[in-house]
């Protein structure tokens, strides 16, 4: 089997009450196929039911499928089919009402995405402090924002080298992705739709100046 279009008549373990349940129904209907639903309450229950043979396939967010497969006794005996039947971006979340912390979390991620766009990595970030690109210099805390006399960190309650420290210690978005969940890890996820907009895909970030 190499495609979800071959799943007519399959039994599917699916977590009830989720958007995945609705997306699956739409996909099968749009492709003129039928399926037998095997309802479960949690991802762990879906894993157990699938491994016990209660269903032919198991569906959830793609990242969840890859993570589950990595924990199976023999991951190579299972495949994640290539079709992406819906696009539901996942990202960091914080407690409601803590807007300052939400800004820090949001811009920490954005800084890593901008760094990838600019070609800034954990290995060249010191060299990039000598860049001629104004946005790179502001991101790394070398230059201030206009005539404010302040760096981006001031609007987040952080030092101006906050983004530099993230990139130096963690890397840009690509480095972090490839290190923790990329194709050379047990989870083995390709960038796919998580690639940058300049590669004709989804990821980009606003400028920190939008925050100032």
Spans of model-derived segments:
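Bilobed "Venus flytrap"/periplasmic-binding protein-like clamshell domains
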Residues: 1-47, 63
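Extended ligand-binding regions for polar small-molecule ligands
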Residues: 11, 16-18, 64-65, 82-164, ...
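A ligand-binding cleft/hinge motif common to bilobed small-molecule-binding domains
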Residues: 23-30, 51-52, 56-80
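Short beta-strand->loop
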Residues: 36, 71-86, 96
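Alpha-helical segments with a strong preference for the paired helices of cellulosomal dockerin domains
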Residues: 45, 52-54, 212
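Detector for small/aliphatic-rich hydrophobic stretches
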Residues: 178-183, 187, 197
């Amino acid at each position: 089997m190499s495609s979800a279009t071959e799943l007519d008549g399959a039994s599917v373990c699916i977590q009830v009450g989720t958007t995945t349940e609705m997306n699956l129904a739409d996909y099968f209907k749009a492709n003129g196929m039928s399926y037998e639903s095997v309802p479960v309450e949690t991802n762990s229950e879906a894993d157990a039911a699938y491994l016990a043979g209660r269903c032919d396939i198991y569906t959830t967010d793609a990242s969840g499928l890859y993570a589950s497969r990595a924990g199976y006794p023999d991951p190579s005996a299972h495949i994640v089919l290539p079709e992406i039947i819906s696009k539901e971006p996942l990202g960091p979340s914080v407690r409601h009402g803590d807007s300052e912390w939400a800004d820090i979390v949001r811009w920490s991620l954005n800084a890593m995405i901008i760094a990838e766009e600019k070609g800034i990595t954990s290995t060249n970030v010191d060299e990039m402090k000598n860049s001629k690109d104004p946005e790179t210099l502001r991101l790394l805390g070398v230059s201030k924002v206009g005539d404010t006399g302040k760096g981006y960190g001031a609007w987040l309650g952080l030092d101006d080298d906050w983004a530099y420290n993230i990139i130096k210690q963690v890397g840009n978005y690509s480095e972090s992705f490839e290190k923790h969940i990329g194709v050379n890890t047990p989870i083995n996820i390709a960038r796919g739709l998580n690639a940058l907009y300049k590669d004709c895909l989804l990821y980009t970030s606003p400028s920190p100046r939008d925050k100032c």
